[in-house]
Curated annotation (Swiss-Prot):
Taxonomic source organism: Idiomarina loihiensis (strain ATCC BAA-735 / DSM 15497 / L2-TR)
Pfam families noted in UniProt: HHH_5, RuvA_C, RuvA_N
Span list, region Flexible linker: 144-156
Protein name: Holliday junction branch migration complex subunit RuvA
Alphabetized GO MF terms: ATP binding; four-way junction DNA binding; four-way junction helicase activity
Protein family according to the UniProt entry: Belongs to the RuvA family.
Record region (Disordered): 136-157
Family matches, as InterPro entries: DNA_helicase_Holl-junc_RuvA_I, Hlx-hairpin-Hlx_DNA-bd_motif, NA-bd_OB-fold, RuvA, RuvA_2-like, RuvA_C, RuvA_C_sf
Amino acid sequence: MIGHIQGVLTSKQPPEVVLDVQGIGYEIQLPMTCFYQLPPVGETIKLITHFVVREDAQLLYGFISASERSLFRLLLKTQGVGPKLALAILSGMSADEFVMAVNQNDVTRLVKLPGVGKKTAERLVIEMRDRLKDWQPSTPFTDRAPLDSQGMDAREHPADARTDAISALQSLGYKENQAEKALQKVYSAEHNSETLIRLALKQLS
């Protein structure tokens, strides 16, 4: 079990990052709500991790705080929810927003998430309500606020930002036409890919 990883952030390709730890690059997938809080490439960061072993792959999922990882693991206990869907859920809304949606029986909000139909949303509300009774948010390793386009790599080309945003949204479960439609509403050449993804997810949710 790999509980956390600390290393130099060498690549950011939403929703995946690469951390260099003594010459070894670890590919880690993050919910976009965590991705927004990352520092620029080249800085050292520490991520709480969840390790998944499958027959065809070994995957690492990363989080800013232990409570986010705990919520991810609770989601995995729900019937029909695997790591990909859990990642999409926590990309579409913050941990606090998800907990609020469950506590308020807000099925309408949940079905807007990619891969979540009405039955899955109802199951999430029923199965997660009791599990979340003792859930408490914890302090993340970094107190960085979500970074805007000024805090990211200014060298990113607008066309690349749009392409990366579409790719990231598709990896989270949205169809290409859904991603395109959402990006049309928020696109600006001044936005980098992370800002575009954040704004598009607001449109989609």
